[in-house]
Regions:
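C-terminal helix-rich "cap/oligomerization" subdomain common to oxidoreductases
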Residues: 1, 25, 65-70, 295-335
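N-terminal Rossmann-like dinucleotide-binding module
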Residues: 1-45
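Beta-loop-alpha module in the N-terminal Rossmann-like domain of NAD(P)-dependent dehydrogenases
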Residues: 6, 34, 45-108
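Hydrophobic residues in well-ordered beta-strands that form the structural core
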Residues: 51, 90-91, 116-118, 147, ...
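Rossmann-fold dehydrogenase core element
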Residues: 104-121, 141-145
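C-terminal glycine/acidic-rich active-site capping loop/insertion
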Residues: 121, 240-311, 335
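Predominantly a Rossmann-like dinucleotide-binding segment in NAD(P)-dependent oxidoreductases
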Residues: 122-203, 330
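Contiguous beta-strand/loop segments that form the cofactor/metal-binding neighborhood of enzyme cores
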Residues: 174, 180-254, 290-304, 322
Length: 335
């Protein structure tokens, strides 16, 4: 059985730890900055060992993977610590607050020979997986234009995660890793970025929405919209047809041979997730967490890089910081 040590027990950690346990891993150790919170979390999830410092977790060392679920500013230090102790590591997104830190993390894990992945769950939503598979099948030929629309943090989400209200370039740092990862998974690498920020709420001085236009290496124009939609909507226009994932999570594939319609709502309610959180984020998002965990576990057990391995996710992070540069300069940025 895979043994996991958890670092951090904030809002998303509860869903992630439950997913590990449901998927058959054993969560054996926990560290959090606040010991009282760690003790309560460990009792709730039956985690046998709680430590006062990260170093103590690694000194104990009876685990396979360090799962880092802290706030982003702590990711680099903990990842480098794991690499220095020869421990495989999974890091929550975003990988780190700066591109330079992300590069150091990837290089340190590569040098140490440890398995390194990023917990990037959005590409594992059932509707998103169906859309990516349809695009990659070649049924519509070469993609000419695509549009990806995802929900950005609105007031309800910011109340759950108040740090978002003061996070510089908030919408890009919070949702950029998700939407750009999906764009890359579906349409390949990108070579340019133009991003426009949107400020929706009086008294909140960080951007909560964004419109980003990217040019893919293969020539496709990909528009990434981070707006206050409830459900995602994706579209790809190709030389031979069109693929649309609509607001009801129904996939429409239209070619000269006709239209195929596929209902991608394949998830069921997960009873370990509070109903309020399920309704706030949507079942498609919450269900992606155990799917992502399962994909990470399979890759790890097979001894192969995860789809969201550190080196791959670094390319997504480059897009995030290109978008930030475009925000700040008002100009398109070459990747």
């Amino acid at each position: 059985m895979l043994r996991i040590a958890i670092f951090g027990c904030g809002y998303w950690a509860a869903f992630q730890v439950a997913a590990w346990q449901v998927q058959g891993a054993e969560v054996v150790a926990l560290w959090n900055r606040t010991r009282e919170k760690a003790d309560a979390f460990a009792e709730k999830f039956h985690i046998p060992h709680v430590f006062d410092t990260p170093e103590e977790v690694f000194d104990w060392g009876e685990f396979d993977i360090a799962d880092i679920i802290t706030d982003a500013p702590a990711h680099e230090e903990l990842t480098l610590l794991a690499a220095s102790r020869g421990k495989d590591v999974i890091c929550q997104k975003p990988m780190a607050p700066t591109l330079e830190a992300c590069v150091r993390m990837v290089e340190a894990c590569k040098k140490a020979g440890v398995w390194y992945a990023v917990h990037e769950n959005f590409r594992f939503q059932p509707p998103t997986l169906a859309f990516i598979d349809a695009v990659k099948s070649g049924v519509i030929g070469k993609v000419l234009h695509a549009e990806i629309t995802m929900r950005s943090p609105d007031l309800a989400i910011m109340e759950k995660q108040p740090a978002l209200k003061v996070m510089p370039h908030m919408v890009l740092r919070d949702m950029g890793p998700h939407i750009f990862d999906v764009a890359r998974a579906a349409f390949g690498e990108m070579k340019s970025m133009y991003a426009v920020p949107v400020y929706s709420y009086e008294g909140i001085d960080v951007p909560d929405a964004a419109i980003c236009t990217l040019r893919a290496d293969n020539g496709a124009v990909v528009t990434c919209n981070l707006v206050h939609e409830w459900n995602d909507r994706f579209m790809a226009q190709g030389e031979k047809g069109r693929i649309v994932l609509d607001h009801d999570n129904v996939l429409h594939i239209t070619t000269d041979k006709g239209e195929s319609v596929i209902d991608t709502k394949t998830w069921n309610y997960l009873p370990y997730i509070p109903q309020a959180d399920w309704e706030l984020h949507g079942g498609h998002i919450m269900y992606s967490i155990p799917i992502c965990i399962d994909a990470l576990m399979k890759a790890y057990k097979e001894g192969v890089p995860a789809a969201t391995n550190g080196a791959d996710n670094l390319e997504t992070i480059r897009l995030v910081f290109a978008a930030i540069e475009s925000f700040d300069t008002g100009r398109a940025v070459e990747i």
